[in-house]
UniProtKB/Swiss-Prot annotation:
CDD domains: HFD_TADA1
Entry's Gene Ontology molecular function annotations: transcription coactivator activity
Transmembrane segments annotated in the record for this chain: none
Functional description taken from the UniProt entry: Component of the transcription regulatory complex SAGA, a multiprotein complex that activates transcription by remodeling chromatin and mediating histone acetylation and deubiquitination. The SAGA complex predominantly acetylates histone H3.
Record-stated family: Belongs to the TADA1 family.
Organism listed in the record: Drosophila melanogaster (Fruit fly)
Name of the protein in question: Transcriptional adapter 1-2
A Gene Ontology term for the protein's cellular component: nucleus
Keywords: Nucleus, Transcription, Transcription regulation
Amino acid sequence: MLTDRVLATKEALVVALGDNWERYRANMKNWFRSRWTKEEFDAESRKILTPDKLHLHNQFLLALLNKIDAFAPLENPPAVQTSSSSGNRSKRRKRSSRTFAERLNFELSDVLDFVAEDNMQIIRPPTTIGIPSDQQQQQLQSQRYCAQELFLPDAGFIMGRFLIGAWEIGLVSVDDNVAEYVAMAVQVLLKDLLSAIIKKRKHYKTSGEGNFYYDVGAPLRDPSLRNTVTRQKVDDTPLELDKELNTANFMRRQNDDVTFLSACEEVQPTERTVITLKDCQLALRDRNLIGSHAVYSINMERLNMMMH
């Protein structure tokens, strides 16, 4: 329904604009690229539309924003407790079910609470004394890059840009699943990049076939030392039976084990350093991380410019 409404309002706007549709689409790209604010986009759109066709611009913009907002997860409203004059048994059932529902529900927290204080000025500008809060909310930019917001793009963010790109090359619309797949692909790509950077800096263990890695940051063992505690098996010596409990006693040489383990520990702990641009450059030398040569070359060029 939302896709049909976007296409219907878009076709009506194309007919009303005529040759100015390309100019209108270019203005929308500037708004999506954060070059213009929403107010500037509305002002430029009013210049190429007559007053009797201005409502088509508002309908198209409203349908497009509703389409993008449809990808946002809806918050479940709290269930309304209905009162009834039933017996004590029904009241007990309601009380127990309400307690169980309260256990399942949780209060959503603001994502900005988990952002570092150094980055809060980028996301949420400081309030100005003497200016009402309503005017301050209007001064905030409605569209920002993901690098400025410090959050990964969601499906709605990607869907709006996909629609503009599809209309540019002559496509009618974009399927909703495409935006969700791209959002998941961005998360997987970022996970692979971070994993490659960390594995270049830290030791880690792999599974038998080498497909999975784990225990990242494990210290490298000294080959000249032999830890006899970890090499011994459970059944290497006869079991000692407890005569009182008649159960197997697996506590063997406890004091000696502590001594051996303390002797095999590291004398100096490993120093934790910050991930630098050099670490990113070394990790990106693996061409399997980024398959696209265009994306790889652009990011490597940006890394080199930031390092020099």
